[in-house]
Amino acid sequence: MKMKKFINAPETITDEELVGLGLAYPDILTVDGHLVISKDLADADRVTIVTYGGSGHEPAQAGFVGKGMLDVQAVGDIFAAPNGQLVFDAMKLADKGHGVLLLTLNYAGDQLAGKQAMKLARKAGLNVRQVVTGEEIQYDPNGEDNKRGLAGAVALYHIAAAAAREGKSLDEV
């Protein structure tokens, strides 16, 4: 028997996943296009936290959006980083006047999108900082700079979110 997939059409899977996420957790988050937004963001009087990445491993980063965790995630297509403009839009949306921390996984596409977004954010006058994960020791084919930093991202999300909620400054977070 041939294995079936829970996919209606490959070209709409990301949009459908995000709609489903919004329907499953309406009390925690909202979905606006390819942005997953914490319901807690509206009242945020603190440093806010944004991350981004390709879809395909849901709930992945989007599953960490919500009260006490991430504020916004920009979602790319399957295994592809979102473009820099979408990441910038996420930072702009998240900015509540105390600064925005952009958490980046160490993948080439994510690095490129983050660099573009940071350039746009600085040009717009946003107070932003970027942290790139890179702790992974299992996967290191070309040297230390290529460590993906996937596993440590979850701990980083928790630590940064806790510091932000304690009222720490952007540099402290």
Feature annotation, model-predicted:
Residues H57, F64-G97:
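Glycine-rich oxoanion-binding loops at beta->alpha junctions
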Residues M1-I49:
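N-terminal amphipathic/basic leader segments beginning at the initiator methionine
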Residues E58-Q61, Q85-F88, G109-K115, Q138-P141:
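Short glycine/serine/threonine-rich phosphate/pyrophosphate-binding segments
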Residues K2, A44-Y52, Q61-A74, I137-P141:
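Gly-rich Lys/Arg/Thr-decorated short loops/hinges at beta-loop-alpha junctions or inter-strand turns
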Residues K4, V47-G54, L70-Q73, G99-A108, ...:
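Short glycine-rich or small-residue beta-strand-to-loop segments that form or flank ligand, phosphate
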Residues K5-N8, G56, V75-P82, L105-G109, ...:
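Alpha-helix capping and helix-loop boundary segments enriched in small/acidic/polar residues
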Residues F88-N106, L112, D145-H158:
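A structural-propensity feature for long, helix-poor, extended segments
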Residues V131-D171:
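Short alpha-helices
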